[in-house]
Amino acid sequence: MDLFEYQAKELFAKHNVPSTPGRVTDTAEGAKAIATEIGRPVMVKAQVKIGGRGKAGGVKYAATPQDAYEHAKNILGLDIKGHIVKKLLVAEASDIAEEYYLSFLLDRANRTYLAMCSVEGGMEIEEVAATKPERLAKVPVNAVKGVDLDFARSIAEQGHLPAEVLDTAAVTIAKLWELFVAEDATLVEVNPLVRTPDHKILALDAKITLDGNADFRQPGHAEFEDRAATDPLELKAKEHDLNYVKLDGQVGIIGNGAGLVMSTLDVVAYAGEKHGGVKPANFLDIGGGASAEVMAAGLDVVLGDQQVKSVFVNVFGGITSCDAVATGIVKALGMLGDEANKPLVVRLDGNNVEEGRRILTEANHPLVTLVATMDEAADKAAELASA
């Protein structure tokens, strides 16, 4: 889960990472009131989960509360790369002597953690990596040893930070690592991390991504969910612990196992080329269990998408056998009743597949078409969706 900057700075405050005071608002009047309360020049910053805010006019310096009001009026409602600005962070402006870059992230390719640090902050880090790679330090972090002050100082040193700020920067870097671990983050990024004229180190920007797989031990993270901006079908799926991502096609997809579902998306997209450009409507992995309740929840989510014209249920029976899956489908259709009103193409394979097919055949549900192979099923689902 990506956080808004103001949410990330709440975690900064929780873990004593130095930053500038500020508050969030959704009105121009609120921005003026916060600026008045701070009593100094402020930055008015669009809250969107995308980079490039400054270039798009989403970050403005306000010398007075009235300036904050005017900037807020212009920024609210702004479209930044498809993200509409609905909230603003109004934070105290800071005098800046130098700008640096610091991040911790999960390095999936090397199965470790990575610290990245550069004296070239305040610009796109991809640009630094491309034009000045020698100025960007990439330091592997041992997950067991972590980051103490000595190692944090080494990270800053490898990032070419000036000698006079190494010790101060090390303290902040160590605190950012503590946050990264304690909050189960996959990314903590500060750009810029600045040195003030009096040699303080401040995190002026904040970007944090939290690992949704750790939600079970991070109940406090639920408050960060932007439910108003989240697709209601994705919210419904999450309530049932289903892995669902809405796409823009017409064939609903239900499968067990992420790899199988990804393969199903591919074959449906390929088959859809012959049927007017039909595409998959979603990714939905029901996991290892395909009980009637789980299948009903999955069908309820997929059928709730008005774009869906047909549904492809693609299940490989393993620990959960095909007869259990078939029974789940039949019961799920009974539980949903009239809400199940779109054709289903079902392909079963694996453990006890013949019994599973027999159950579906004998049920003889008018919405269900049983198909033997994945390619044939994808073609049938695409054909039904294009009809």
UniProtKB/Swiss-Prot annotation:
Organism lineage string: Bacteria, Bacillati, Actinomycetota, Actinomycetes, Mycobacteriales
Function: Succinyl-CoA synthetase functions in the citric acid cycle (TCA), coupling the hydrolysis of succinyl-CoA to the synthesis of either ATP or GTP and thus represents the only step of substrate-level phosphorylation in the TCA. The beta subunit provides nucleotide specificity of the enzyme and binds the substrate succinate, while the binding sites for coenzyme A and phosphate are found in the alpha subunit.
Reactions listed under catalytic activity: succinate + ATP + CoA = succinyl-CoA + ADP + phosphate; GTP + succinate + CoA = succinyl-CoA + GDP + phosphate
Family, as annotated: Belongs to the succinate/malate CoA ligase beta subunit family.
Pfam family, one: Ligase_CoA
Sequence ranges assigned to domain ATP-grasp in this UniProt record: 9-236
Positions with a binding annotation for Mg(2+): 191, 205
BP GO terms, sorted: succinyl-CoA metabolic process; tricarboxylic acid cycle
Protein name: Succinate--CoA ligase [ADP-forming] subunit beta
Binding site for ATP: 45, 52-54, 94, 99
PANTHER family (alphabetical): SUCCINATE--COA LIGASE [GDP-FORMING] SUBUNIT BETA, MITOCHONDRIAL, SUCCINYL-COA SYNTHETASE BETA CHAIN
Keyword GTP-binding: no
PROSITE patterns to which the protein is assigned, alphabetical: ATP_GRASP (PS50975), SUCCINYL_COA_LIG_3 (PS01217)
GO cellular component terms, A-Z: cytosol; peptidoglycan-based cell wall; succinate-CoA ligase complex
Taxonomy, superkingdom: Bacteria
Cofactor(s) this protein requires: Mg(2+)
Species whose genome carries this gene: Mycobacterium tuberculosis (strain ATCC 25618 / H37Rv)
InterPro entries on file: ATP-grasp (IPR011761), ATP-grasp_succ-CoA_synth-type (IPR013650), ATP_grasp_subdomain_1 (IPR013815), Succ-CoA_synthase_bsu_CS (IPR017866), SUCC_ACL_C (IPR005811), Succ_CoA_ligase-like_bsu (IPR005809), Succinyl-CoA_synth-like (IPR016102)
Residues annotated for substrate binding in this entry: 256, 318-320
